[in-house]
Amino acid sequence: MKSLFLILILCITIPLIFANESQYEDHPITKVTYGSMVKLAHVPTNFRLHSHKVSYGSSGGGSGQQSVTGFPENDDTNSLWVIKGPHGNRVLQGTVVKNGDIIRLVHSNTKKNLHSHLAVSPLTKQNEVSCFGENGEGDTGDNWIVETESGKEWMRGQVVRFKHADTKTYLQAIESAKYQNPIPGQIEISGGKSKNEDTKWRTEEGIYFDEK
């Protein structure tokens, strides 16, 4: 009976997977939409925005919250983020994200939100960027303003910046700020006051929903 159930599930899911792939080939999805699960690449380094069940220290101004890093490889599921509406608001899946929208980025594996605050980052001593909340529920420190370089809508592969709504700092990575043990080779993600090359990001791998 269990074998029959498994066969039925495979018969249902496999065609759906291939249907989605063929749909993308016939009708490329060019716009970034709410509900999509994406990887974000730091433009200067090509590192992916990443989180994991490793916490910052609480001494020296750290928060003790789940850490966020830049990861050098593109094949880790801990680099997947789901695009959601701002804290306290729901946005329909498939709605196009526009320049100036306030969004949350929910870490797919741990269900915590990309977050920032006035706690101090461990290496560069700028604003710490962490993951916070439970099952996608956090606070206004999870809100980020989308700033596209051109156009009114966030397009796949386009350079984009994320400005933290509460602190007005920009999500950034600095290649020289590299961690040692227990996460060697990964780089610090922090909130920087200046809009510069280190604050540029773009979408890469992921599951993208067509616009509605």
From Swiss-Prot:
Chief location of this protein within or outside the cell: secreted
Signal peptide as annotated in the record: 1-19
Transmembrane segments: none
Gene Ontology CC terms: extracellular region
Pfam family, one: MIR
Residue positions the entry lists as glycosylated: N20
Cited InterPro entries: MIR_dom_sf, MIR_motif
Domain MIR: 29-86, 94-149, 151-206
Keywords for the protein's UniProt record, in alphabetical order: Glycoprotein, Repeat, Secreted, Signal
Protein name: Stromal cell-derived factor 2-like protein
Places the protein is found: Secreted
